[in-house]
Every structure is written in C-alpha cells, then in structure tokens.
C-alpha cells in the first residue's frame, strides 16, 4: 500500500470515528489536542486501525500514536 493510500485510509477512519471534518485531519493534527478526542476515542481509533490494516498495536506503541503522521509512520513500519 502506498504512503498516500495509507494516509487517506487513516484520515478516513479518523473522520468516521471522531466525527470531525476531513479538512481538520492534517498530518500534524493531534487526536486529543486538535481533534477533540478523549482517551476512549483514542482506544477506539487504535482498534479501528488494527482492524482496517490487519495489524496489532501493543499498548506501549499505542500510547505513542498521537497524530495522523504517527499512525501512518507506524503502519508503514509494521507493514514493511
């Protein structure tokens, strides 16, 4: 999967999960600070990423995923 399609899919998941407008979901947007997510939202986001990308995100890694760019980089790393 190309970088752009990963980012597009991540952005789409965030829009669906958080109910935010797509133009607010930028690469640097932080889930809690910029997109209004709470801790439950972030858990649900990680679960959605795991399901949609067929990956497993350990809790210690999930805590590091705070922005769109963080998630895209992590998915690229684990999908090799």
UniProtKB/Swiss-Prot annotation:
Subcellular location: Cytoplasm
Record bears the keyword Lipid metabolism: yes
Ranges of residues in domain Carrier: 4-79
Recorded name of the encoding gene: acpP
UniProt modification remark: 4'-phosphopantetheine is transferred from CoA to a specific serine of apo-ACP by AcpS. This modification is essential for activity because fatty acids are bound in thioester linkage to the sulfhydryl of the prosthetic group.
NCBIfam families: acyl_carrier, PRK00982.1-2, PRK00982.1-3, PRK00982.1-4, PRK00982.1-5
Protein role: Carrier of the growing fatty acid chain in fatty acid biosynthesis.
PROSITE patterns assigned: CARRIER, PHOSPHOPANTETHEINE
TM region positions: none
Annotated metabolic or biological route of this protein: Lipid metabolism; fatty acid biosynthesis
Principal cellular location given in the protein's record: cytoplasm
One Gene Ontology biological process: lipid A biosynthetic process
Modified-residue entries (O-(pantetheine 4'-phosphoryl)serine), positions: 39
Keyword Hydrolase found: no
UniProt record similarity statement: Belongs to the acyl carrier protein (ACP) family.
GO cellular component: cytosol; membrane
Record protein name field: Acyl carrier protein
Record-level Gene Ontology MF annotations: acyl binding; acyl carrier activity
Entry keyword set: Cytoplasm, Fatty acid biosynthesis, Fatty acid metabolism, Lipid biosynthesis, Lipid metabolism, Phosphopantetheine, Phosphoprotein
């Amino acid at each position: 999967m190309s970088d752009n399609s990963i980012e597009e899919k991540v952005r789409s998941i965030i829009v669906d999960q958080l109910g935010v407008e797509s133009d607010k979901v930028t690469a640097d947007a932080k889930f809690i600070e910029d997109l209004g997510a709470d801790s439950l939202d972030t858990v649900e986001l990680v679960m959605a990423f795991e399901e949609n990308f067929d990956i497993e995100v350990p809790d210690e890694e999930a805590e590091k995923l705070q922005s769109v760019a963080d998630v895209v980089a992590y998915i690229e790393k684990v999908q090799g």
